[in-house]
Structure formats: C-alpha cells, structure tokens
Amino acid sequence: MIDLYNYSNLEGLLDGLTDLNRIPKEYSAVLEPYFQNIARNAHLKSRALKICRSNFHKWNEEGAKTVNPEIIRRCLNLWYVLKGKEYKKLKDPPPADNIIKDEIDVSYVKNLNEVRLEFDEFGKLISNPLENLILEEVEVNDFIQE
C-alpha cells in the first residue's frame, strides 16, 4: 500500500502549494489531511509557515496583483491547521468560496442502519436515518456582516 503522507510527498506538496498549475484549485478542498500530516513534522511545519508568511506579506503589500486569492485561501487553511488559530494580520482577505454540493438522492439507499445505527431522543432505533434529510442552498453572504 502506498503511503500518501510520506515525507517526500508532503515536501512535494509544499513545493507546489503556491502553483495552481501543479495543484489546481479543484484540489484545494482535499488538502487538509496533507496539512495535518505536515503539522506532525517540525521541519515541514516550519517550511510551511515560512511559505504562508511570505504569501501573506505579498498579499498585504500588493494584494491580488501578485498572489492568487486561492493561494491565500490555501495558506489560511494551512496556517489554521498548523497553528490552531486564524491568521489575523491579513489585510482584506479574499472571500471564502461557497461550498456547493450537487443534488443528492438518498431515497434509493437501503439498509443504512447496517453501517451506522442511529437512535432518537427516546432511545428508539431510527429505521431510515436519512428519510427526513433536507438540504437547502444557502448563500453564506446573507449571514455575514461586513
């Protein structure tokens, strides 16, 4: 079995972190497990923080002229994983991307309770836990005050 989180792979990820040709924007959403493994290695963690600081500095100096907003989002996510807190010194951070999921039809799914049993508040087994699942599209901007 291949170890996706070995030192060499994590080092390669850091090499390409700020290059959208090497790691396209579409992959940003799946980078967190890699970030968590980077956090476990002192050398990689130090290198990652240096990369983030450099990009934050460029962003604060010149904004989106020199640094793609997606790179800043990646660095903000990486910083949060490594430090356990948000980076607060960033001027005018790029807006967060909306999370959009396609419609999902779970009506055909059977035997859901074989994988995971769920119980109601009275301790009674729920036969089809996703039966009443409702997903709605929500604009995050409606809830964020400027």
UniProtKB/Swiss-Prot annotation:
Domain of life of the organism encoding this protein: Eukaryota
GO CC annotations, alphabetized: nucleolus
Subcellular location: Nucleus, Nucleolus
Record's keyword terms, sorted: Nucleus
Family recorded in the similarity comment: Belongs to the SWM2 family.
Protein name as annotated: Nucleolar protein SWM2
